[in-house]
Amino acid sequence: MRYQNMFETLKKQDKMAFIPFVTLGDPNYEWSFEIIKTLIDSGVSALELGFAFSDPVADGVTIQASHLRALKHASMAKNFQLLRALRDYNPHIPIGLLAYANLIFSYGVDGFYAQIKECGVDSVLIADMPLIEKELVIKSAQKHQIKQIFIASPNASVKDLEQVATHSQGYIYTLARSGVTGASHTLKNDASAIIKTLKTFSSTPALLGFGISKKEHITNAKGMGADGVICGSALVKIIEENLNNENAMLEKIKGFIGGMIF
């Protein structure tokens, strides 16, 4: 219900959802908690939180570096502990996870979904799992009331987009471009055709990701019919550039979010 409540509230206000992405434990768990609390307090719509992985193939250099920083001290147990603390901090904000398949399958699919439900997580997006393999996780997601998110890519066929729209819950992660994550100066591709196709099959909100780094990108995304955006690399870059000064990092994050959503 958290996603539904969030989107309904935003619709009444004629606002776009703004969802930041950061990697759990980057640059360490203490700072990570403060970073994510700052995001919540700055008024973001929801959270997209990554589990650090040694081979993050869907990510560009900025987010790859954040995985490597977090991996120095990351563990599944610490991730779950941090998620619980975040849910205790804010009982209402939707929390989504972005993970790579190997982490989930190594842990055990059903055990993973049971654990994240207990932590107060709302959704999971598996970055490197094609839609054709959805049956491997969908039963566990439904059993534990976790919304499974799927990716709509620019190269997907209409049939694939129908499958994505039909099976995605919470929202649909719509790629602004193909390739890997990374901040862009401009949104070069027009995703309006993909979003229009998705909306013919489902009323599930479509969020645009990959390359969102400026306020104008949010305006562009709205013009394409998107219901919101996911912003990762531009935010993670702020973390990377302020590793020696936590206060400066948090102030810059606050300023960045304020400039994007108000």
Swiss-Prot record:
It is an enzyme of class 4 (lyase). It comes from Helicobacter pylori (strain HPAG1). The gene is trpA. The active site is at E48, D59. The lineage of its organism: Bacteria, Pseudomonadati, Campylobacterota, Epsilonproteobacteria, Campylobacterales. GO terms for molecular function: tryptophan synthase activity. This is Tryptophan synthase alpha chain. CDD domains: Tryptophan_synthase_alpha. SUPFAM superfamilies: Ribulose-phoshate binding barrel (SSF51366). Its EC number is 4.2.1.20. Gene3D superfamilies: Aldolase class I (3.20.20.70). Pathway: Amino-acid biosynthesis; L-tryptophan biosynthesis; L-tryptophan from chorismate: step 5/5. NCBIfam families: trpA. One of its GO terms (cellular component) is cytosol. Transmembrane segments: none annotated. Belongs to the TrpA family. The alpha subunit is responsible for the aldol cleavage of indoleglycerol phosphate to indole and glyceraldehyde 3-phosphate. Tetramer of two alpha and two beta chains. It catalyses: (1S,2R)-1-C-(indol-3-yl)glycerol 3-phosphate + L-serine = D-glyceraldehyde 3-phosphate + L-tryptophan + H2O. InterPro entries: Aldolase_TIM (IPR013785), RibuloseP-bd_barrel (IPR011060), Trp_synthase_alpha_AS (IPR018204), Trp_synthase_suA (IPR002028).
